[in-house]
Amino acid sequence: MGRLLPRHLEIIYQINDLFLESVKKQFPDDTDLLRRISFIEENDHKQIRMPYLSIVGSHTINGVAELHTELLKTTVFKDFYKLFPERFQNKTNGITPRLWLRNVNPELSKIITAKIGDGWITELQQLRQLEAFADDPEFQQSWRSVKRLKKEQLANWLKQNSGISIDPESLFDVQIKRIHEYKRQLLNILHVIYLYNQMLEHPELPFVSRTFLFGGKAAPGYFMAKLIINLANDVARVVNHDPAMQDRLKVVFVPNYNVSVAEKMIPATDISQHISTAGTEASGTGNMKFILNGALILGTMDGANIEIAEEVGAENIFTFGMSSDEVSSLAKSGY
């Protein structure tokens, strides 16, 4: 950096010096604090701590979910929170219902608007009015009909574009997101393997017919993520070629996943998996898109899942696993 951008580096050093001098006046005896908050990483190859530079140069630091904001304050940037507590705010990520409901699922939008009007398009809280129709058999049937239609549309699209056949009568269990170890697609795959073995060992049990749909891409150099994709396809190959699994269990890794594909998959989903290790997902917005389209969330208490659970009620979301604090305690105990 010094060779390519010498003046930029000089300015960064100047800002760092001024910042450290101001902190030194507040905490004259805490030299370790100065070392921790310096923009310069002092090791064999000096590096610029860009997040620190950003914090000092910003009037506001936003977390993107309540848990994420709390982690920023107590762990990631706790020294800076001590210096600038007024700068740290929470701004939970969000999505636009114009795209992720009205545009991708016009059929569901139509039956919602028929009941409560179209004010929900710009004031999403108006969807709470639907609670009055939760036990209405006619509305329930309309909702089920839309879900079935979107599943048929996805099945037809997959058949036409990838030659893959899936049964719209089965439960669509979906995990679509960037492939990463912390997002735990591997955990989902292990569950598929477990379910497959259980079906083989106990064919008499009344298992619900289920289609597992995976989608996502790995970073070019992320070897482990590519192994996870490989494993998912290998498991799909075994399960889908087993005659005993006919009409009972199917596994599909949807090729060439992108936003356009997501627009087809999300309205068709029955169960949506958001199972990151607690404390690792900043927020996530896929969970919001799925629940807006009537899917049930299976997830950990991480990111925006926590706030979704508070909003919809614990009885309307499937959660499991450790909390962020429990994960942290386990890590500190030498796990």
Which positions does each model-derived feature cover?
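A conserved ligand/cofactor-binding region detector
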Residues: 1-335
